[in-house]
Amino acid sequence: MNSKLQRQSSIPGFAGYSCAYSPFYPNRLAIASAANFGLVGNGRLHILTTDAHSLSTEKTFDSQDALYDLAWSEIHENQLVTGSGDGSIKLWDIMLNELPVQSWLEHTREVFCLDWNNLNKLCFASSSWDHLVKIWTPSRSESIMTIPAHDSCVYAARFSPSSADTLATCSSDGTLKTWDTRTKPTSRASLVIAAHPNEVLSLDWNKYATHYVATASVDRTVKIHDLRHATTTSLNSNACVETLLGHQYAIRNVAWSPHAADQLASCGYDMTARVWAVPQIAPKLPHPHPAALIGIHHLHKEFVFGLAWSLFQPGLLATASWDQQVHLWSL
């Protein structure tokens, strides 16, 4: 099934890297972007608003380096953080002009992922090409925890939606790891899963069955892992319960639906975004069918990096692409 384009907007001169809906306002969307495809030059944070007929830019904030990711605050409806190519993290208040409210510089390489804790709303996590994951709180000028998570680039770090102290990470080393942030030393993972034979670029926790984690890889697959199948004593290779095939090139992002336990979306370098049904993880279905592709959005003309489900309107997705376009669409 092809997608239905609902609204679109352009971000001229900037490649879209990440997008996120506000957890407070149904009609507000933020985009992290970079000039020159993120290779050199500045970045821009775009705040977009949508109504029944249009998607328009409300405000923009410029940064000195590319912006690769963002996360809305869970405690302040007008604030969000961005991660940059120079290793900096900035906290912005969209009711103010130009300058960030707070800035941190501890990472020594690109910050590629930011995730605000949905349960402990005072903190957020960052992951970087410097192999580290850091946890922050806006009230402090330095990080409150540093985890040497992998021996190579950490593409994503995301908090569990059911445990404030549990974090998952994925890396160019092909592994998916989980961490208990209460445990010392923080260099020891709770679980280590051999997720893919290639780099793992993205992960997401299922919001309804939180023992399931989806990963997306350079190997063109999305894999779904059941953490209950993993043991704490060794590298696990038997946690994968489903592999989703269909993308033609590397998959940049994966996200479970916030409204349907058995649906997830993915996007990547084949210029498409896809929605999948994974009915076997929905316990109410007595005779689940195999996982299946249920829709494709193929209207972008460049790599699709940003992907977000609407938190208020079931089935509505946003994508941000290197074609300098933001699309809102549904199946």
Describe each model-derived feature in a short phrase.
Residues 1-181, 187, 191-208, 215-217, ...:
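WD40 beta-propeller repeat fold
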Residues 229-231:
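Hydrophobic pocket-lining "lid/loop/helix" segments that shape and contact the acyl-thioester
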